[in-house]
Structure formats: structure tokens, C-alpha cells
Regions:
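Catalytic-loop region of hydrolases
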Residues: 20-112
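Glycine-rich nucleophile elbow surrounding the catalytic serine of serine-hydrolase chemistry
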Residues: 162-172
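Alpha/beta-hydrolase active-site loop
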Residues: 133-152
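Bacterial Sec-dependent N-terminal signal peptides
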Residues: 1-27, 204-212
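Alpha/beta-hydrolase fold nucleophile elbow
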Residues: 154-164
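Alpha/beta-hydrolase
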Residues: 7-8, 172-310
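C-terminal subdomain of alpha/beta-hydrolase-fold enzymes, centered on the catalytic histidine
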Residues: 265-404
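Conserved alpha/beta-hydrolase
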Residues: 106-126
Length: 404
């Protein structure tokens, strides 16, 4: 989602002492020397993007349990990209595994950035492994510690950001540590209040136009009606791409993929409903559209297992969404709309929405210096922040915008 005009203008107002002119960089060796003096981090120089002068892959040693700082540790991967120590710092709090890339905000502000991988994802998996330390608060403590560490070097303004689950993480961090940064820009940060948040259902029933919603529904119905033609294609696709569906079950996974379509279409689609196939379309056209917009690869074993940390968080604190099955009851044989198959087999999560409700209330009524950005078609906007006008925070919704 690209907000190219308003965000720069707002930041110029919020940070009127910023200087965006290029300055002669004399701090390269100074930064590396400083990094080498910090205990409990590992530093490797990497090639920077062209807007930066230096970049590093860094592993920060973190307590697995911040309530027991002398206990077992793990290494959390971050990427630091440098321009000037006096310029702003954008810190992206990612919700998943992370690869180094340049954020929209650091390009706009021509400033430094840190990309933070989320605990239990990618290269940042604790050992010994214990699900109970994968919590919102523990991750916020990770982020707080990283910010404290690098504030010793970077004296400019700090801006936190994140996309999708990372946007939620920026909100979570702000709730626990509001003084850590000067401003926050969460992109598409949902705050679910239930394991099957009903706001998602209502969103899908009201987004776009009645004609477009009808085309989405009719396509789902078409996929069920053409099950005998499409299901063998899914099996062939699975064989070619070495996908298995043993966790959910092959036929049940097909049904959930069709149910997921209405969510996935609005999440990632461009809103051009004229491109949705209908009963006059060929089986190949239906399949290609389904593959591009549905959940065919969302329910395979590898995808589920790689997302186990996310799903564990959904079933403990984050919340999630389920699927409405009543309108397809004449077609469904296996799916009941719930997703317990997403829960890691070696875990026993208990869902507790109390923290999310507190954070949602805080974000709506008390959060200062936030710019909440959402997409107008994205179902994840439905559990987004609803501001009450009590603070200086603003919410921006891109018309017809997706999750991207």
C-alpha cells in the first residue's frame, strides 16, 4: 500500500527539524567500531541498498524469558542499514521471519533503518524451545531492548513501523513502551478480539459493490459445483510442486481453499471483479484464477508448519477468523469453518482475549503520534483500530487498497 503524498507531508510537520539533504558520510568506520564494542551481538557486514552507506546483519542475544534475564538466551536476527547517526531511525518490527529490504518510510525520510525478525520465526528460534515464551509482551520486550541498545548511537528521531502482523507488533510495542519512539506507522495492523472475529464476516458482506460481492460468492459456488473437475487438478498441482495436505486432509483442504477465496480475493485482489470467471469460463480459466487468488497453498503441510508460531499466537492472544459455511451447506462434506488443524501438535494453547481488548482500547483512545494505514478492500481492515479523536493519531484508508 503506497501513500506517497500524505505520509511525507505529515512527517515533515511532525519532524520539522529533520534535514533530508545528503551529508558527507564520515562515520562508516565509527559505526562498525561501535558495534564491535557491544557485548552479546554478532555483526556481519553486508551490501547496503544504494540509499545507505553501510549495512549489517546482526544477531542480538536476548533472554528467552525477559522476566528471567539471567536464564537461557536466544539470538534474534536484525538488519541495520545506515545513513547518518544524527538522522531518523525507522525500525520495522516484523511479525514473521525477515529478509533485509528497504522500507517505504526510510526511502521517504532518507534515513537509517533496522529490520527486526520476530522471536520463534526464521533464524530467531529459541533453544530450548518452549511455546509459553511466545507472547506479545515477550516480543515487545525484545523490541524495547533493541531500541535501547541502538539509541546509544543513533540520536535522531525514532519511528516504529510494521506491515500486517508487524503492524500489530508496532501497536503492541507502543502499548507497553510508548516512550521508546517518537512516532509509529503501522501498515494494516489488525487487532482481533476473538478466535473467530465476526467483524471479518461483516466486512466481506459489505465490501465493494453488491454486484462484485455476488461475483465472488458465485465463483466460490462454481468451485464447489466443479469439484469433480478441479479436485484432480489440485492433486496434480500438489504432485508437481511436492505439496502434501495430510494435516488438514486432501478433500477438506480443497473445501477450505474455496472458503478462503472470499477472504484472499479481497486481501490481495485489485478489485476488478470483471476478471472473475463465471459458469461460461473454461475449467482452466477457473483453475488459474483460483490458484492466483485462493488458498490452495495456504492449507498444505509445509505452509501450515512454517506458520505454526503465527497460528499458536492466534490461538493464545492474537485471535483469528473462521469461515461461514451455512451458505455452502449443500456442497460441503468435511469443513465446519473452524481451524483447529492450525494449532501446533506439540502445544496446548488457551485463548485469552483480555490483552488484545486492552490494547485495542488504548490504541483507539490513548495512543499518541500514530499513523494507522489500511487498505479499503482488505478484510484485515475490519479488526483495525477505530480512533475516537481523543489523541493526535490519524487513520488513513486507501480506497480499493489491498493488504499489499
Amino acid at each position: 500500500m503506497k501513500i506517497k503524498l500524505l505520509v511525507p507531508a505529515i512527517f515533515l510537520l511532525m519532524f520539522s527539524n529533520f534535514s533530508f539533504s545528503q551529508v558527507e558520510d564520515t562515520l562508516n568506520s565509527d559505526l562498525y567500531s561501535w558495534l564491535k564494542t557491544i557485548p552479546d551481538i554478532e555483526v556481519t557486514a553486508i551490501k547496503p541498498d544504494k540509499i545507505f552507506t553501510e549495512a549489517y546483519e546482526i544477531f542480538v542475544t536476548q533472554p528467552i524469558d525477559h522476566n528471567n534475564p539471567d536464564g537461557p538466551k536466544f539470538k534474534e536476527q536484525i538488519f541495520l542499514s545506515h545513513v547518518d547517526k544524527d538522522k531518523p531511525m525507522v525500525i520495522e518490527l516484523d511479525g514473521y521471519a525477515v529478509n533485509n529490504r528497504t522500507t517505504e518510510l526510510s526511502r521517504i525520510l532518507e534515513c537509517n533503518q533496522i529490520m527486526v525478525e520476530h522471536r520463534y520465526f526464521g533464524e530467531s528460534v529459541p533453544s530450548p524451545f518452549d511455546w509459553k515464551y511466545l507472547t506479545i509482551k515477550q516480543a515487545a520486550d525484545d523490541h524495547h531492548r533493541i531500541i535501547e541498545l541502538f539509541k546509544d548511537y543513533y540520536s535522531g528521531k525514532w519511528i516504529s513501523t510494521g506491515i500486517s502482523k508487524g503492524g500489530s507488533c508496532a501497536i503492541f510495542h507502543g502499548y507497553f513502551y510508548p516512550a521508546d519512539v517518537n512516532a509509529s506507522v503501522p501498515y494494516v495492523g489488525p487487532l482481533n478480539l476473538s478466535i473467530d472475529d465476526q467483524r471479518v464476516y461483516e466486512w466481506i458482506k459489505s465490501v465493494s459493490t453488491p454486484e462484485c460481492r455476488e461475483k465472488v460468492f458465485n465463483f466460490q459456488k462454481l468451485c464447489f459445483e466443479k469439484r469433480d473437475e478441479l479436485y484432480p487438478i489440485i492433486l496434480k498441482n500438489a504432485e508437481e510442486k511436492k505439496l502434501t495436505y495430510n494435516i488438514v486432509g486432501y478433500e477438506k483442504a480443497y473445501e477450505y481453499s474455496v472458503l478462503e477465496y472470499s477472504f484472499a480475493y479481497w486481501q490481495w485482489g485489485n478489485g476488478d471483479c470483471s476478471l472473475i470467471p463465471d459458469e461460461n469460463s473454461s475449467t482452466e480459466e477457473i483453475w488459474e484464477h483460483f490458484l492466483a487468488n485462493g488458498g490452495v497453498t495456504y492449507f498444505d503441510d509445509e505452509s501450515i508448519e512454517s506458520n505454526y508460531p503465527f497460528f499458536y499466537q492466534c490461538y493464545t492472544e492474537f485471535g483469528y477468523y473462521a469461515y461461514e459455511v451455512d451458505k455452502f451447506k449443500d456442497y460441503i462434506r468435511y469443513a465446519d469453518g473452524q481451524t483447529p488443524f492450525f494449532i501446533p501438535k506439540d502445544s496446548n494453547p488457551t485463548y485469552d482475549p483480555r490483552l488484545l481488548k486492552k490494547i485495542n482500547n488504548w490504541a483507539s483512545n490513548e495512543a499518541e503520534n500514530f499513523i494507522f494505514i489500511y487498505g479499503g478492500n482488505d478484510p484485515w481492515t475490519s479488526p483495525g483500530v477505530c480512533l475516537t479523536g481523543k489523541t493526535n493519531s490519524i487513520k488513513m484508508v486507501l480506497p480499493n487498497g489491498s493488504h499489499a
